[in-house]
């Protein structure tokens, strides 16, 4: 029977990040394929026939994008792997940001034809702030791509991180024949495209005369020159990789499976087991026998068979055991978590135990919030909070059918608690209308879709001119008596805090100037 340290040491918890359409979800599926978690990948059959395994919300399947973070666990090569597949669309960057807080490393997927794109830069910065290992997979080598050396140089120039090509592509597009493994000093020649099944691979030495028969003399000579050029570059430094200073680069095609298995195996060997976490008391040792975790995501109605709400927890230390009594620090309540679950997108499985590095889902009766800490009874430390993004777009929302008010209130309250979409009440107006704030406008579509399909409520939505929010820290009078300028409004969040929405920065100055003693704070962490 494995010890606590052995179980934790074999955990690998990582997020996959990319710009939209770089192939992130396809690569995730192929990891599941090679890990034996699925028998056949769904990507190649098309969205209409079979949606991606990691996309569970109906709107994701219809639009072909990921709008929520999916959690998947599987076993491979002696490792227990937790993949966090994140939304690539910029409108859902907040959910991605929170997910990255739960990851120990990141896989950055880059389109070989396009290079580093805007969303890639944004997500990379979040990873870099935490100094977690970042691995680069340059995808779509089965299509015409830019020069591999140029792509590596762009990653270094645009993102400010050193790179080390672990393998090197042999051709691209229709000529993509395989990769050269620099560590093993051999060619991995791909004999047939895997698509929904595993790709065929033949290993052959660079100086083997038979290589010319496989790839031709010209490509063999070009490869030899490129390998010699790479040898004159920087050396591989595993310590630099694990501290986020050096990004190992791999080339391949997630669609055809070329290069996926070598990448997965090398990544699992190079990346770190679970990392220590910072709390307000001290750094928490992952190998401590005492359980601790934090909530990084809340999701209601993951499918129609489960009309419930799950809180996703990242275990930070020790071992979780089902039916054991734990302590919710924020509420000061003891609780017994009797139905913990691991996930494969929307599919669930009850687990009896889990370890540091694992992600579990627990039923949320309405007490959890993003960033909450769960510990053993008697331990009251808190993990560092998870910031939220300030909304940039606002709408006034009400139910079209006033008879659906109860369903409207339930939907609004549950979606507000998830945190990805900010919802505010208008003081003293009940729930006739609410103000919805989002980072990107596509989130309005998701909100409207969920209210209709999960709660049966059609919405009336109209745009509002607000651009900024400020939290009222101190108010010298009743908020109803504040002197507001045109285009400003007092709102209330679901924690009972009062805020003011503004149409522009000049409005902030007007308010503080004409309301002596009023103190406003910028958008705060959850």
Language model segments and positions:
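Structural and coupling elements of P-loop NTPases
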Residues: 1-526
